Amino acid sequence: MVSVINTVDTSHEDMIHDAQMDYYGTRLATCSSDRSVKIFDVRNGGQILIADLRGHEGPVWQVAWAHPMYGNILASCSYDRKVIIWKEENGTWEKTYEYTGHDSSVNSVCWAPHDYGFLLACGSSDGAISLLSYGGEGQWEVKKINNAHTIGCNAVSWAPAVIPGSLVDQPSGQKPNYIKKFASGGCDNLVKLWKEEEDGQWKEDQKLEAHSDWVRDVAWAPSIGLPTSTIASCSQDGRVFIWTCDDASGNTWSPRLLHKFNDVVWHVSWSITANILAVSGGDNKVTLWKESVDGQWMCISDVNKGQGSVSAITEGQQNEQ
């Protein structure tokens, strides 16, 4: 049974574009066209406003929490072409870094798994993807993939650090040899996979073609060590695809249509166990989908989104605006 356990009145003055829980599930970050980022304490069903962060000069599209091993850190991106990294010090949130290396709207930010290091991917309407890595002493190193997507990049999502098949193949006590990968979706109707080479440069690893309009979001599913990699993608064409790869080399990806919606699909988000997918679309609903034992994806719930509020859903710990 899926039910709404909490609804947070954010008091944003315009449309909410993203809402993300932190690692521990006690804090909620939201962002809006009103140019603000807000952080709430949502423990025990409450909603206490902790911070109202003002630093962007345009609509804020997305927020992303860093792993807590790096402290209480939040990244945000905006139409104003900026990425801002916020940090909490002694109970006060402050801007700790501002990246202005893009020529157009920055549409997506995503922190890499902590096993990869303190690393942030940023996708922009200028077609480029930036990789920001912390080098210490307040310094950030920037690598940029130019022309990653024709017209623009709308979404980025990191591959999990758990290696597919490690649950059955990894020798006991042996340190994993991680290969950094992430997925991106763009205005060229493509999902692309990127891999870091031994020399530290990033190259296109795979190009996944199935959508007939702009790819609005991609989400690489968490891995529990089973020998399958899974990615969800959604598009302006109203379709959601589930991409799976069963070979160890990661070269063969197969798409499966989850559903064809009657409107644009803006976001897809996996539960932490990767067995439930939340889909948020232009029909003002969030639907939850679960794979049955025979491999069919079934809709198990749909929730109407509120105006200016964020709802927390019990099943799969999914959170959508």
Model-derived features with residue positions:
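Loop/turn segments within WD40 beta-propeller blades
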Residues: 19-25, 64-71, 110-117, 157-179, ...
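WD40-repeat beta-propellers
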Residues: 37-42, 83-88, 129-134, 156, ...
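Beta-strand-rich domains and repeat architectures in extracellular enzymes and scaffolds
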Residues: 9-35
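WD40/WD-repeat beta-propeller blade N-cap
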Residues: 9-16, 53-60, 99-106, 146-153, ...
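Conserved strand-to-loop turn within each blade of WD40 beta-propeller repeats
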Residues: 31-34, 76-80, 122-126, 134, ...
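Terminal intrinsically disordered, low-complexity extensions flanking WD-repeat/beta-propeller proteins
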Residues: 163-170, 177-180, 216, 226-229, ...
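A short helix->beta-strand "capping" segment at the edge of beta-propeller domains
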Residues: 1-13, 46, 254
